[in-house]
From Swiss-Prot:
It is found in: Cell inner membrane. Keywords: Cell inner membrane, Cell membrane, Hydrogen ion transport, Ion transport, Membrane, Transmembrane, Transmembrane helix, Transport. The keyword Cell inner membrane applies. It comes from the Bacteria. The chain crosses the membrane at residues 239-259, 354-374, 437-457. The keyword Transmembrane applies. InterPro entries: CemA. This is Proton extrusion protein PxcA. Required for H(+) efflux immediately after light irradiation to form a rapid H(+) concentration gradient across the thylakoid membranes. Together with PxcL, contributes to transient H(+) uptake following dark to light transition.
Length: 477
């Protein structure tokens, strides 16, 4: 008996409806099978550990095969979970009362049994999360939460977890390590991959922007990104203040407490009393200062300004000409002797201060190293913050900063600045100033620094911001 076209059409619609309603279960099963295959590879070839290149004695070809299989299964999990989430939300909103009661028995049983399978669905999703999350978590997950490359919340679903893993595992093994150097290599590799799109990038960006503006979750996403940026800024500023202020406070506290006490007591010992000056430069400065003071006394006495220097002479009502020369010289010698004692105490304190600075700076350096080593998460956040600030500048601003720094440290007038810096450093530590060392340093270090600047511009800035390099060359010319 022939079936009428209307019944054939109605049966086709029912079959299509049945196929569509089985889409969530079908997609979940495919994702579950892919997760099972990943787990099988882990147990058979990696002793139950995650698939990686660490401490596994396989050849490069074998490792490449395992990685390709891992990427394939992770991609299946990503796509099928996206299909599951989309289809389950659509199927759940359908009005069950409008479904034709005459559809086949299998479809009716499926609709009745599907709500009771929630525990099975949850078990499968939990297993998929357990397998795929191993390739999402890294050894420093907290530091990567605020990284600019990671825009996914910590409590994301399996789709977000797998998506981040696929993006990392799509590259060779030697760029999938957790260190910052490998992250830089990964970014460099991504930048070298040619992007051959049929449509222009500007048009695609416009479509993407319109899509984001029409997204009902766009406002929530903007607020989330703003809060994330705010937390990143506050964390970076707090870390900068911590790195600067804590070593300075430790330096001052140690100088006025135990370090200062120990140095002062040691330098006041009898065998140290004879050493008035820490180095020959201090002694030369003290002698010049004493000689200038003596010449000043003679000069003012000849000009009749002695009342300020010798008030005891004028209490008796005598003039300078009435005082014998030998007596005047004796008074000047007495003043010079008193001044010499003051200068000796002054330069003795300067020498002690230089020794204190050596120990206190060493303690501050240890404090700085401890802060850096114990605050790696804040250090990663600061690095991300500085990247945002630097790469957020315009090309003209970048070129201006580069020219300012190069002219300041390696430019024509930089030797005078380096000379002042070296003199202050030697005085800070109480060391003798060496003109030969200063000239040698000025002749070599700025040249090395200039070579480093040029290499950085050629190697990195020329790739990340070619327009900034062009602007820099035009401004420098």
């Amino acid at each position: 008996m022939a079936i009428s076209p209307w019944k054939q059409f109605k049966l086709s619609v029912l079959n299509a409806n049945q196929w569509f309603r089985k889409t969530p279960e079908r997609a979940l099963n495919m994702a579950y099978d892919a997760a099972n295959k990943i787990r099988s590879i882990e147990e058979e070839h990696f002793e139950g550990r995650k698939i990686s290149n660490v401490s596994i004695s396989y050849s490069n070809s074998t490792k490449s095969y395992f990685n390709s299989q891992l990427n394939r299964y992770l991609k299946i999990i990503q796509v099928r979970l996206a299909e599951f989430n989309t289809s389950i939300s659509v199927v759940g909103t359908l009005d069950q009362n409008k479904v034709d009661k005459q559809k086949d028995k299998f479809d009716q049983n499926y609709q009745q049994e599907f709500p009771g399978r929630s525990s099975i669905i949850l078990d499968k999703l939990e297993f998929i999360d357990q397998v795929s999350s191993r390739y999402y978590k890294s050894s420093n997950h907290e530091a990567q939460e605020l990284n600019t490359d990671l825009e996914i919340p910590h409590s994301s679903s399996s789709i977000a977890i797998v998506s981040s893993n696929v993006n990392v595992n799509n590259y060779p093994n030697n760029v999938r390590a957790g260190s910052s150097q490998n992250q830089n290599n990964l970014a460099e590799l991504k930048s070298n991959i040619p992007n051959t799109n049929f449509l222009p990038r500007s048009l695609l960006k416009t479509f993407k922007k319109i899509k984001q503006e029409l997204d009902p979750e766009a406002e929530t996403e903007v607020i989330r990104k703003f809060r994330k940026s705010q937390i990143k800024t506050l964390t970076s500023v707090r870390f900068i203040l911590l790195v600067i202020l804590v070593p300075l406070l430790i330096h001052q506290l140690s100088k006025i407490t135990f370090v200062g006490y120990l140095v002062d007591n040691f330098m006041s010992l009898p065998h140290q009393q004879a050493e008035l000056f820490l180095n020959s430069n201090m002694e030369e400065e003290a002698l010049v200062k004493l000689h200038q003071y003596e010449e000043k006394l003679h000069f003012k006495m000849y000009l009749g300004q002695a009342p300020e220097l010798f008030p005891e002479l004028y209490e008796s009502g005598k003039e300078i000409t009435e005082i014998p020369k030998s007596e005047r010289e004796e008074l000047i010698e007495h003043k010079v002797e008193k001044k010499a004692q003051e200068i000796a105490l002054e330069y003795k304190a300067k020498g002690n201060n230089g020794i204190k600075n050596i120990f206190c700076d060493f303690i501050s350096l240890i404090t700085f190293v401890i802060i850096i080593s114990t605050r790696k998460r804040e250090l990663e956040v600061l690095k991300s913050f500085m990247d945002d600030v630097v790469y957020g500048l315009s090309d003209s601003a970048k070129a201006f900063i580069i020219i300012l720094l190069t002219d300041m440290f390696v430019g024509f007038h930089s030797p005078h600045g380096w000379e002042v810096i070296l003199e202050n450093i030697t005085r800070h530590f109480g060391l003798p100033e060496s003109r030969d060392f200063n000239f040698l340093f000025i002749a070599t270090f700025p040249v090395i620094l200039d070579a480093v600047f040029k290499y950085w511009i050629f190697r990195y800035l020329n790739r990340s911001s070619p327009s900034a390099v062009a602007t820099y060359k035009n401004m420098n010319e």
